[in-house]
Regions:
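Aromatic-lined carbohydrate-recognition surfaces of secreted/lumenal glycan-active proteins
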Residues: 1-32, 82-85, 124-130
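An active-site-proximal structural segment forming one wall of the substrate-binding cleft
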Residues: 1-11, 34-45, 104-116, 120
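Extended low-complexity acidic/polar segments
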Residues: 3-12, 41-46, 51, 58-59, ...
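Aromatic- and acid-rich polysaccharide-binding/catalytic face
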Residues: 10-11, 15-22, 35-62, 67-92
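A generic structural signal for short
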Residues: 26-27, 58-59, 98
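Aromatic-rich peripheral "rim/lid" segments of glycoside hydrolase catalytic domains that contact
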Residues: 65-169
Length: 169
């Protein structure tokens, strides 16, 4: 990674922001801490890391306390923080209760991002797969993880996520 950052700085646009990105940081706080230590290592070798990205492919039952802890740890780095991928799987045949839990989780993630990541460190949230996955999809086949259903109708998760994003203003 040290060499990758060195070459990106040398040959890339001087204004580019360079991120290190990983997944499951909200599931494993030790992994999150390890990534933060890795950033420190890269920087100890003379290369600047502008930001940290987290891929959050979570479920309606994700551990909310760990999500909050992850954002707190990432914020403490002083780096730009981006949720580079976010989806919340509600299962193959979700009930109305499951869909409400999904909506609540999308909102929770946006609210915790706004609560713990200072405005100057926020680099955004990218939703991964806006619509639910088709049964033959290569990503979460048949899951109901999107903000829209397969008929492109907004789900409760759409409004809840939007409400959560309002917390960042």
């Amino acid at each position: 990674a040290v060499e990758a950052f060195k070459l990106a700085r040398k040959y890339g646009n001087a204004a580019d922001k360079l991120f290190i990105n990983d997944y499951n940081l909200e599931y494993s706080i030790d992994k999150c801490k390890g990534l933060i230590e890795y950033v420190k290592y890269i920087e100890s070798k003379g290369q600047k890391v502008d930001g940290i990205g987290t891929q959050m492919h979570i479920t309606i039952n994700a551990d909310k306390e760990k999500i909050a802890t992850m954002f707190q740890l990432l914020a403490a780095t002083g780096k730009l923080i981006k949720v580079s991928e976010l989806d919340v799987a509600a299962g193959l045949k979700p009930t109305q209760s499951d869909l409400q839990l999904q909506a609540d989780m999308y909102k929770y993630v946006a609210e915790m991002y706004a609560k713990y990541i200072p405005a100057k460190q926020r680099y955004g949230i990218t939703v991964w797969g806006l619509i639910d996955s088709k049964p033959d999809s290569s990503w979460l086949p048949g899951q109901n993880q999107g903000l829209w259903n397969l008929e492109f109708t907004r789900k409760a998760s759409y409004s809840s996520f939007a409400d959560g994003l309002k917390a960042s203003k």
